[in-house]
Curated annotation (Swiss-Prot):
Role noted for this protein: Involved in base excision repair of DNA damaged by oxidation or by mutagenic agents. Acts as a DNA glycosylase that recognizes and removes damaged bases. Has a preference for oxidized purines, such as 7,8-dihydro-8-oxoguanine (8-oxoG). Has AP (apurinic/apyrimidinic) lyase activity and introduces nicks in the DNA strand. Cleaves the DNA backbone by beta-delta elimination to generate a single-strand break at the site of the removed base with both 3'- and 5'-phosphates.
Catalysed reactions, as listed in the record: Hydrolysis of DNA containing ring-opened 7-methylguanine residues, releasing 2,6-diamino-4-hydroxy-5-(N-methyl)formamidopyrimidine; 2'-deoxyribonucleotide-(2'-deoxyribose 5'-phosphate)-2'-deoxyribonucleotide-DNA = a 3'-end 2'-deoxyribonucleotide-(2,3-dehydro-2,3-deoxyribose 5'-phosphate)-DNA + a 5'-end 5'-phospho-2'-deoxyribonucleoside-DNA + H(+)
FPG-type ZnF: 251-287
Protein name: Formamidopyrimidine-DNA glycosylase
Length: 287
């Protein structure tokens, strides 16, 4: 599943062709993705202008010039394909096959500039909806979300309060979207390794100074990943078709049995399964 840096990269790729553009044609080729499309989906969007394309957690938000916001979630395998009028393809993809299969093309947007943006989703775990902009923050998808990890609201004081008295490990809590929005398995593993904090240590026993280091590590990892265009594992390319390359900077993720890259550490990266997810860490320097 794409994490915050990948979704932000997709947003950056789609923004130039969607922001300030009027949608002259919208086609819903099936009535549902993970959830049914809302009534009037095509009619409301046709003729609307996407004023701004934003991201909240792992959601893309198309702010319309009407009362609604177009909410899009990529799920496990959703991706966008951008086709310019001259036929040039600039795909922004989360994909499981090298070439799009037309049967997986579920939603098509066409702008007044003649650009066609097609949403493909083989697994159909992604979804789209229209939510009233005035009450967006109260919607169940957003009401319980914590602060954005790159915002000023996500700081050591916030995380210390979230960790206080908790017996769970910090990884479990950082993946809780109510504590911080948008973090996923890859970047939590990476940040904990940089901060040299064990993913299994009871969070309530982590000191304030170490939490300050962890917050800084989270922000650094995310900024670097966004600058690198995300991580290309098996299913991701940027909105211009180029591959993200942050995976080449991984210190822990998917590096089981390899040397830890932290300075002065001679440990070997291990892997444990927590709640069905692989946790990569160094048992030597992460305490």
């Amino acid at each position: 599943m794409p994490e915050l840096p990948e979704v932000e990269t997709v947003r950056g790729g789609l923004a130039p062709v969607l922001e300030g553009r009027r949608l002259v044609r919208v086609e819903a080729r099936r009535p549902d993705l993970r959830f049914p499309l809302p009534p009037g989906f095509v009619q409301i969007l046709t003729g609307s202008t996407i004023v701004k394309l934003e991201r909240r957690a792992k959601y893309l938000l198309g702010r319309l010039d009407r009362e609604d916001t177009l909410v899009m979630h990529l799920g496990m395998s959703g991706r966008f394909e951008i086709a310019h009028p001259e036929g040039e393809e600039r795909p922004g993809r989360f994909h499981y096959a090298p070439d799009p299969d037309p049967k997986h093309a579920h939603v098509v947007f066409e702008t007044e500039a003649g650009v066609r943006i097609t949403y493909y989703d083989p697994r159909r775990f992604g979804y789209m909806s229209l939510v009233n902009t005035a009450t967006l923050d109260l919607h169940p998808w957003f009401a319980g979300l914590g602060p954005e990890p790159l915002s000023d609201d996500f700081d050591a004081a916030h995380l210390k309060a979230a960790f206080t008295g908790r017996r769970q490990g910090p990884k479990t809590l950082l993946l809780d979207q109510r504590i911080v929005a948008g973090l996923g398995n890859i970047y939590v593993c990476e940040a904990l390794n940089r901060a040299r904090i064990s993913p299994f240590k009871p969070a309530g026993r982590i000191s304030r100074p170490r939490i300050e280091v962890l917050v800084a590590a989270i922000k650094d990892v995310l900024r670097e990943a966004i600058a690198a265009g995300g991580s290309t594992l098996r299913d991701y390319a940027q909105a211009d078709g180029a591959l993200g390359y942050f995976q080449h900077s991984f210190r822990t993720y998917d590096r089981e049995g390899q040397p830890c890259r932290n300075d002065g550490c001679r440990g070997v990266i291990g892997r444990e399964v927590q709640a069905g997810r692989s946790t990569f860490y160094c048992p030597v320097c992460q305490r």
